Structures are given as C-alpha cells and as structure tokens.
C-alpha cells in the first residue's frame, strides 16, 4: 500500500478511536512501529470496540466515547465471548462456505489487544507516574497456536502449489480453456480484464512478490526490457526484484491494451487498473484474491496469491538449491524463513525417485 494511502486510512481510523488508543498510537509511533503494523492494530481495535458497543458492554454512542473503565473492568468471560464471536461470525472473503475467522486471525486480534492492555497497565504514566490501571485481563486469556513441523507444513502446502509444468499450465488454462466454459455474458466480462488478470497472475508466479507489493506497483516501477520491478517491501523499504522471462508476453499484452481499455489519463500511474463507472482506479488486493481464487479453483485447487509466492520460491530453490538466493528474491533478511522450501523440494525429489 502506498504510504500516502496508508496514512489516509490510518487517519480515518484514528478519528474513530478513544483518546487512550490515540495515546497508544503516538507512543508506538515513537518506538517506532511501522505504519503498516499500526494500521493493522487500529483495524483490530475498530473490530473489538464495535463488538463492545454491539454486545452492550458499553452504552456509549460511538467508539470514541467508550471510557477507559470499560477496558479496566472487562472480565475474562467478556473477552472469551469476543473470541467466540470471532469464531462464529460469517467470513467476509471469497469463500463464503465457512463460518468464523481462522485461529491465525484470532491470534492476531488478541495480540493487538494484548499490546494495548500492556501499554495501559504497564507502560503509560499518569500525572503520578502510575499506569492508568493495573488489571490486565489479556494475561488471563489463552491463545491456541498452531504447532507443526516444517515437514508437516510442507506436506500441507505442496498440494496447493503449481510446480513444474503447472505454472505455465495454469496460465494457459486461464488464457485458452477457461473461456470455453463460460456463458456468453460471463465471457464478455472475462474478456474485459483477461490481459490484466493474466499479467497479474504471471507476475506473481514469476517474481514471488507479496500481493500488497504487486497491487501497489506503478507503471514506472516496471522495467520490461530488464524484467525488473521496483517494489516497496515491509517497513517501507524499496527493493528491485527480478521477474522470470515467462511473464514478459503477458505483461506486454496487458500494456498494449491498458490505456485504451481502462481509459487512462496521465495521472493514472497505477500499473494494474480496474474500471468502475468509466473511471480507472488501482486494483485492490481483495479483487486480486477473488480473481486468483476463482481461476485456481477451476484449474486445480483454490489458492491464495500467497501460494503463488510459495510456488515461485519452491521452483527457484529447486533450480538453484540456494536459500540465500530465494531469501533475496522474496525480500527476507534471513534464510530461516526459506527452510520450508527445502522440505517441499525434498518431497518432490522423493516422488521423482519413486516413479523411476
């Protein structure tokens, strides 16, 4: 997400928050926490405080009016009710057949709340040099962390990767086979964004960039001749990322129709666009997630854009056997994160031997 857009969204959330959350924000900004982290925390607080109002724990008219005493007097039972609410609420994503958010999402929410409670009960000082209150209910709330070995994780992930010929096969399917299954109306809709969709998916498969890094690319960030993109990594760090050659024709096809198809002006700097009511806008992450889910489910198995990142990393490690190279490609500071791909490749090698 572009810094200016991120700051705009942070400001909107800050306008909703109680004064003690705003103090927390300023304190963590001085650490410094990244704007991305603080934005994610503010979204979690918005979700929590909205539930506080809906459940009647506070009779305040709006989130900004919720008094500090509500957090001070929050019981363990109240917090467990919030966790149950998260587990049972309908999912707001492309897969609507499941109920409740994942344990990973719940842990992220509780982590944000734990950070806020620690600040209020230990870190902040009032005029007397004391914290605002001492009772930290979050210390009584248990979180369940998913435990699995790298080998187990590799086994779970590898079925959702497009390895070997499946990378090009996936792109060919979208380009040639998927349209044959569509009604005339659906085909018309597909053709409007066919080149863009293929370019995005090809880029994800050929570079391994994160979804946020891809959707925030500007036209000037793509060097088609050198097959390099300039991205903004986590922590707002700029990085140059090599792109595999197989993505080039898909990017060229998209660029050939981009200006006319999406009615661009000079001010439309985003690389990947969507057209809404005749006005071009930067495509958002949610749209790409739904697009990848739709195409991948029809092709083989429903996956997320992050699985396309795993696909590139696994293929690159298989070709080079270099964790350092894979780490650099993914933008990781350590090779520890790439240990997963050694296990996936080992399984692939075993399967190859078994087939001899």
Swiss-Prot record:
Q: Where is the Tyr recombinase domain?
A: 169-354
Subcellular location per UniProt equals: Cytoplasm
What is the official name of this protein in its record? Tyrosine recombinase XerS
Any one GO CC term of the record: cytoplasm
Read off the PROSITE patterns from this record.
CB, TYR_RECOMBINASE
The UniProt function text for this chain reads: Site-specific tyrosine recombinase, which acts by catalyzing the cutting and rejoining of the recombining DNA molecules. Essential to convert dimers of the bacterial chromosome into monomers to permit their segregation at cell division.
Which protein family is named in the record? Answer: Belongs to the 'phage' integrase family. XerS subfamily.
Residues of the active site: 210, 234, 306, 309, 332, 341 (o-(3'-phospho-dna)-tyrosine intermediate)
Disulfide bond entries: none
Activity regulation details: FtsK is required for recombination.
- Show the GO MF annotations: DNA binding; tyrosine-based site-specific recombinase activity
GO process annotations (BP): cell division; chromosome segregation; DNA recombination
What are the record keywords, sorted? Cell cycle, Cell division, Chromosome partition, Cytoplasm, DNA integration, DNA recombination, DNA-binding
Coding gene?
xerS
Note the InterPro entries from the entry.
CB, DNA_brk_join_enz, Integrase-like_cat_sf, Integrase_catalytic, Integrase_recombinase_N, Integrase_SAM-like_N, Recomb_XerS, Tyrosine_recombinase_XerCD
Q: Say if the entry is tagged with keyword Cytoplasm.
A: yes
Spell out the NCBIfam families in the cross-references: PRK05084.1
Q: Where is the Core-binding (CB) domain?
A: 16-121
Recorded hits in HAMAP family, A to Z, give: Recomb_XerS (MF_01816)
């Amino acid at each position: 997400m572009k810094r200016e857009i991120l700051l705009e969204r942070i400001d909107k959330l800050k306008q909703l928050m109680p004064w003690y959350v705003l103090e927390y924000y300023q304190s963590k900004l001085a650490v410094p926490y990244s704007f991305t982290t603080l934005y994610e925390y503010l979204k979690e607080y918005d979700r929590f405080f909205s539930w506080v109002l809906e459940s009647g724990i506070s009779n305040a008219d709006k989130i900004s009016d919720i008094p500090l005493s509500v957090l001070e007097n929050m019981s363990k039972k109240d917090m467990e009710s919030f966790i149950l609410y998260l587990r049972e609420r309908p999912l707001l994503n492309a897969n609507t057949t499941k109920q409740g958010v994942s344990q990973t999402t719940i842990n992220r929410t509780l982590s944000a709340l734990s950070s806020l409670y620690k600040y209020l009960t230990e870190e902040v000082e009032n005029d007397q040099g004391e914290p605002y209150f001492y009772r930290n209910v979050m210390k009584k709330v248990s979180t369940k962390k998913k435990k699995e070995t790298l080998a187990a994780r590799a086994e779970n992930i590898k079925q959702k990767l497009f390895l070997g010929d499946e990378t090009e096969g996936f792109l060919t399917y979208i380009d040639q086979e998927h349209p044959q299954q569509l009604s005339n109306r659906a085909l018309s809709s597909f053709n409007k964004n066919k080149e863009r969709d293929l370019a995005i998916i090809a880029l994800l498969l050929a570079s391994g960039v994160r979804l946020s890094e891809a959707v925030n690319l500007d036209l000037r960030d793509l060097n088609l001749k050198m097959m390099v993109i300039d991205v903004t990594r986590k922590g707002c760090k700029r990085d140059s990322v090599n792109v595999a050659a197989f993505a080039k024709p898909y990017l060229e096809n998209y660029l050939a129709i981009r200006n006319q198809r999406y009615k661009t002006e000079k001010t439309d700097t985003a690389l990947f666009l969507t057209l809404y009511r005749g006005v071009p806008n930067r495509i958002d992450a949610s749209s790409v997630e739904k697009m990848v889910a739709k195409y991948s489910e029809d092709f083989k198995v429903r996956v997320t854009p992050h699985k396309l990142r795993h696909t590139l990393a696994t293929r690159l490690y298989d070709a080079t056997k270099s964790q350092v190279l894979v780490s650099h490609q993914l933008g990781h500071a350590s090779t520890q994160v790439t240990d997963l791909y050694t296990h996936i490749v080992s399984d692939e090698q075993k399967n190859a031997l078994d087939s001899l």
